[in-house]
């Protein structure tokens, strides 16, 4: 019965008019992210130890709490018994694979912070022929369904945890960036997943942006990944909500 929900979700997705029969939604098809096995297994060890009360789950932006965001992490999040389950380059389908292969098994966190999906929107720096390939190019709706599947898996594994779904961060120089627009469209959908009881939604995008929608390189030098200043902004924007969920 492990994949029953996933199978039903996939069938419903493929039957939807949003998706043609020849365009499967890769965002909900669990697949190993090659080269990440060692880090994945380290998460399984943490899960079995069962000590973490707060888990951050996501892609490179989450992963980099151990890099550009480390000073902020050590000051604010480490004292809360937090664990970092971020893997650079991960998409929703990679997180689903991880959840199917031991992540969170035996772990009973009080809260989970989830942000995933910008790599489903598009990988920075990939050749155009790959970006145009359906495996790499998801619609906002497809990405949102992938996030919904992750939520279902997390709730099954950690029924008592409160999950904070973060809006996908803004990217690109300004509001005309197509990847940013798609992230915003995804956020508009996943906002509806919050029930105010076990699942919550928080979008901190405006904290990174200028009044005209410009994304400053002083916060995200590559217009995608925050620097240390950006991690402080992120931390400050969600700290109160996360601590509320940990009570």
Q: Where are each of the predicted segments found?
A:
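N-terminal secretory targeting modules
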Residues: 1-57, 61-75, 243-247
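Short amphipathic alpha-helices and their capping/turn segments at secondary-structure boundaries
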Residues: 41-55, 96-106, 151-155
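Structural recognition of the beta-strand scaffold that forms the well-ordered cores
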Residues: 53-58, 81-86, 110-116, 120, ...
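A structural signal for short coil/turn segments at secondary-structure junctions
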Residues: 49-50, 77, 158, 194-197
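Catalytic His-Asp segment of secreted/periplasmic serine-dependent ester chemistry enzymes
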Residues: 169-247
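Oxyanion-hole/transition-state-stabilizing segment in secreted/luminal serine hydrolases
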Residues: 63-78, 92-144, 153, 164, ...
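Solvent-exposed, acidic/flexible segments
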Residues: 54, 85-88, 92, 136, ...
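Generic structural signal for well-ordered alpha-helices
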Residues: 147-152, 187
């Amino acid at each position: 019965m492990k994949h029953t929900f996933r199978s039903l979700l996939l069938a419903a997705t493929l039957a939807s008019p949003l998706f043609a029969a020849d365009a499967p939604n890769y965002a909900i098809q669990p697949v190993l992210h090659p080269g990440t096995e060692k880090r994945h297994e380290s998460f399984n060890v943490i899960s079995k130890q069962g000590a973490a009360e707060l888990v951050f789950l996501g892609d490179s932006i989450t992963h980099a709490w151990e890099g550009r965001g480390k000073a902020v992490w050590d000051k604010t999040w480490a004292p809360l018994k937090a664990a970092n389950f971020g893997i650079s380059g991960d998409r929703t389908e990679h997180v689903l694979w991880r959840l199917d292969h031991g992540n969170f098994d035996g772990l009973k966190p009080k809260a989970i912070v989830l942000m995933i999906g910008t790599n489903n929107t598009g990988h920075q720096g990939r050749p155009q022929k790959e970006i145009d390939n359906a495996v790499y190019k998801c619609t906002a709706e497809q990405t949102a369904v992938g996030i919904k599947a992750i939520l279902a898996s997390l709730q099954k594994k950690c029924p008592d945890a409160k999950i904070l779904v973060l809006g996908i961060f803004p990217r690109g120089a300004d509001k005309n960036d197509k990847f940013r627009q798609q992230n915003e469209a995804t956020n508009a959908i996943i906002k509806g997943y919050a029930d105010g009881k076990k699942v919550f939604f928080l979008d901190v995008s405006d904290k990174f942006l200028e009044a005209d929608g410009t994304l400053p390189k002083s916060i995200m030098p590559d217009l995608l990944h925050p620097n240390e200043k950006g991690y402080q902004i992120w931390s400050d924007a969600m700290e109160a909500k996360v601590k509320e969920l940990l009570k």
